[in-house]
Swiss-Prot record:
It comes from Oleidesulfovibrio alaskensis (strain ATCC BAA-1058 / DSM 17464 / G20) (Desulfovibrio alaskensis). Sn-glycerol 3-phosphate binds at T12, R82, E83, Y134, D243. This is Glycerol kinase. Its EC number is 2.7.1.30. Keywords: ATP-binding, Glycerol metabolism, Kinase, Nucleotide-binding, Transferase. It catalyses: glycerol + ATP = sn-glycerol 3-phosphate + ADP + H(+). NCBIfam families: glycerol_kin, PRK00047.1.
């Protein structure tokens, strides 16, 4: 009898495979980093073949380390960095260009052009998104317009487009399945979140041939089987969700009004709004959460581009820490930020500002400023960006959050979690299993094959590790927030020229 579900978690900096038991516990993990390519300032690429090679390697490695064979795996769930765009040759399977990553800003001018054409309202109404270089649609257009011969091949039906889930499944099935799910499709700027299908008007606006697009499946259904070559036997692929939607599901935020924040490379807060798509009046995104047999669920989302990446910058860019976990002790060595505010707008500002020309800014620096103050200001910036989003979410949905569930690598940082509760003024709940992105993909896959019986069973499995209660005076909080808002204004529209 099958005892496990295997989650493939294809992230921005590494590919991972995580094996889960029926209790939702982790049996084994394998992880492999891959190359980040920065051809020009503001451009970020990945080698699509390296993405699949690392994903395939960790999949096999995870099972080997666990001493588990493929016949014990009931199904595979896939979750992935969203928006990152691959275009490949339908016949040979070869990418025509490196994958263009979600952080990449090269299509900012295409976005400006679309805004000038007065398309913002159409895009928001149909897709729930704002016009921004973040989403896949303009990246596909850029590849078709800039890779010699690509547009002609696309018109002839010879090219495929996919987000990373689609690319991984295409390769796992040796080109047999070209498929995505609604959560990923809803991040392309080509998909109508109300009809649940690709939108002809949007395809026309971005000049993308429909023949390139994958079919759109549910998030929890058997969509493919792996080619036996990979694991020695075919294993069903029965769960797909973009990383943030998967994390929402994995954190058991399955009912309307529940919210989670994932602290990874970026920071992503999602609020489950049930079966109703709320189009935001506060510059948040409306996105499909998941489409399962129980229905299509929507979320409000606020995206922060730089969260954990600010700690990587302290390590790799400034060299003030040797490893990411050191940041907590360094920040704790001072009682406060010493007046320093850091706005990590390295790739522009995400929600609710959506300023692609904002740049990183550090203010309040004096001769007395030390690396500890900068480290503390960096951690605080993660929590303060989250506060900006929560304020907007509460306005849009007309609710006051009772608590925020937190997941992702940076939740291990107790100082950050406590500071987050302090500035939000609501408790922050950290679950026992913080790998909720992979867990969400596992849940979606397991539900589709009867490994778990119901969403109620999943809700009951969620376990609390620690609850951080707000513990900051209103006066201190107000001063921090006031200085933060001033610093954000100074970071805006810097790169206009």
């Amino acid at each position: 009898m099958s005892k496990y579900i295997l989650a493939l978690d294809q992230g921005t900096t590494s590919s991972r495979a995580i094996l889960f038991t029926r209790e939702g516990d982790i049996k084994q993990i394998a992880q492999k980093e891959f190359t980040q390519i920065y051809p020009q300032p503001g451009w970020v690429e990945h080698n699509a073949n390296e993405i699949f090679d690392t994903q395939s390697w960790v999949m096999t490695e995870c099972l080997q380390r666990a001493g588990v064979n493929a016949s014990e795996v009931a199904a595979i769930g896939i979750t992935n960095q969203r928006e990152t765009t691959v275009v490949w040759d339908r016949k040979s399977g070869a990418p025509v260009h490196n994958a263009i990553v979600w952080q990449d800003r090269r299509t900012a001018s295409i976005c400006d052009e679309m805004k000038k054409r007065g398309l913002a309202e159409t895009i928001r109404e149909k897709t729930g998104l704002v016009i921004d270089a973040y989403f896949s649609g303009t990246k596909v257009k850029w590849i078709l317009d800039n890779v010699p011969g690509a547009r002609a091949k696309a018109e002839r039906g010879e090219l495929c487009f996919g987000t990373i889930d689609t690319w991984v499944i295409w390769n796992l099935t040796k080109g047999k399945e070209h498929v995505t799910d609604e959560s990923n499709a809803s991040r392309t700027m080509l998909f109508n979140i109300h009809t649940g299908d690709w939108d002809e008007e949007l395809l026309k606006i971005l000049d993308v041939p429909r023949s390139m697009l994958p079919r759109v499946a549910g998030s929890s259904e058997v969509v493919a089987e792996t080619h036996p070559e990979f694991l020695g036997k075919a294993v069903p692929v029965s769960g797909i969700a973009g990383d943030q939607q998967a994390a929402t599901f994995g954190n058991a935020c399955l009912t309307e009004g529940m919210a989670k924040n994932t602290y990874g490379t970026g920071c992503f807060m999602l609020l489950n709004t049930g079966k109703q798509a709320h189009i935001s009046k506060n510059n948040l995104l409306t996105t499909t959460g998941w489409n399962t047999p129980s229905g299509r669920y929507y979320c409000l989302e606020g995206s922060v581009f730089i969260a954990g990446a600010v700690v990587q910058w302290l390590r790799d860019g400034l060299g003030i820490i040797q490893s990411a976990p050191e940041v907590e002790q360094l920040a704790l060595s001072v009682p406060d930020n010493g007046g320093v505010v850091l706005v990590p707008a390295f790739a522009g500002l995400g929600a609710p500002h959506w300023d692609q020309y904002a740049r990183g800014t550090m203010v309040g620096v004096t001769r007395g400023t030390t690396k500890a103050h900068i480290a503390r200001a960096a951690l605080e910036s993660i929590a303060l960006q989250t506060l900006d989003i929560m304020d907007c979410m509460q306005k849009d949905a007309g609710i006051n959050l009772a608590a925020l569930r937190a997941d992702g690598g940076a939740t291990r940082n107790n100082l950050l979690m406590q500071f987050q509760a302090d500035v939000l003024g609501v408790p922050v709940e950290r679950p026992k299993v913080t790998e909720t992105t992979a867990l969400g993909a596992a849940y979606l896959a397991g539900l589709a094959v009867g490994f778990w019986k119901s969403e109620d069973e999943i809700t009951a499995m969620w376990q609390l590790d620690r609850r951080f209660e707000p513990n900051m005076s209103a006066e201190v909080r107000e001063k921090l927030v006031y200085n933060w808002k001033r610093a954000v204004e100074r970071s805006k529209e810097w790169a206009e020229d």
